[in-house]
Design a protein with these regions (language model features):
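Short hydrophobic segments within beta-strands
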Residues: 15, 96-98, 126
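A conserved regulatory-domain signal marking ACT and ACT-like small-molecule sensing domains
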Residues: 1-93
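Short internal beta-strands
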Residues: 120-131
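Adenosine-nucleotide cofactor-binding segment
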Residues: 137, 141-167
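Donor/substrate-binding cores of folate-linked one-carbon enzymes
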Residues: 129, 152, 156, 169-289
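Histidine-anchored nucleotide/phosphate-binding helix
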Residues: 104-115
Length: 289
């Protein structure tokens, strides 16, 4: 006997001014299509009077398409002044990973993607160096070398944006990509580009952060994953974590501990974004874990 295909799953996220009737309107539309809610999370920001919701649901096969659902939901969105996203949960986000010379975050992302822990579709790796090409090749992933110098920076960013368009990229991940992107590129990819910062923001920005941390005698080493904006390392924070250290750790040991934290923090941020669990709330985020 042939096992019937499972019903398609969708994820709906909404953000809007808070008022009565929002949940009723959303669930009412799903009921008209025999939708079954599999997971529902909501948050009411009382300080900003903003309402946030994430719903994962299924509908019977052949009953509706994601495009027609979006069209129907636009009526509700207009009524409640909502911003919303609706995705087929079985279609992974097309993802482009940017890296420079340090490959620990790239290695972690590719390993998790390869074993199915990250629901993304890695479409390629971009780098201003060749160091990580063998790693990408070991996973059968295209490696795009875009050298960056003061003279070629504009061309390199134009090449990056061309790849984003031609590969139909939804998510760009800066996995220790050590180039400052222009304001125009940051704005073009706003809300879909994640960076890992090698410190617990806002501390120790710039070069040699672990040497800065050592000189200050820190007791915690951390990392921050955030959306990229035109304000350097000031974008909305998705995830942070720390590990305890002490006077016995030299700068190299701090850096080794930091690499572990960076990899874990970035992978969590990418997973939550790929599962539509992160909603922007002004300069902050709401993360439905």
């Amino acid at each position: 006997m042939t096992t019937p295909a499972p019903d398609p799953h969708y994820v709906l996220t909404i953000a809007c001014p808070d008022r009565p009737g929002i949940v009723h309107a959303v669930t009412g539309l799903l009921i008209t299509h025999e939708g079954n809610i599999l997971e529902s999370q909501q948050f009411d920001d009382l300080h900003e009077n903003r309402f946030f919701m994430r719903v994962r649901f299924s509908v019977p096969t052949g009953r509706v398409t994601v495009e027609s659902l979006r069209e129907e939901f636009r009526v509700i969105a207009e009524r409640f002044a909502m911003t919303f996203d609706l995705w087929n949960a079985s279609v992974p986000y097309r993802t482009l990973i940017l890296v420079s010379k340090l490959g620990h975050c790239l290695n972690d992302l590719l390993f998790r993607w390869g074993n199915g822990a990250l629901q993304i579709d890695v479409a390629g790796v971009v780098s201003n160096h060749l160091d990580c090409r063998p790693l990408a090749a070991s996973y059968g992933i295209d490696y795009h070398h875009l050298p960056v110098s003061p003279e070629t920076k504009a061309d390199a960013e134009a090449g990056l944006l061309a790849l984003v368009d031609s590969l139909d990229i939804h998510l760009v991940v800066l996995a220790r990509y050590m180039q400052v992107l222009s304001d125009d590129t940051c704005r073009a990819l706003e809300g879909r580009m994640i960076n890992i910062h090698h410190s617990f923001l806002p501390s120790f920005k710039g070069a040699r952060p672990y040497h800065q941390a050592f000189e200050h005698g820190v007791k915690l080493v951390g990392a921050t994953a955030h959306y990229v904006t035109a304000d350097l390392d000031e974008g909305p924070i998705i995830e942070q974590d720390v590990m305890r250290v002490d006077h016995r750790h030299d700068p190299e040991e701090l850096a080794s501990i930091g690499r572990d934290v960076e990899s874990q923090v970035l992978s969590r941020a990418v997973r939550w974004h790929a599962e539509s669990r992160v909603l922007l709330n002004g300069h902050k985020t709401v993360v439905f874990r």
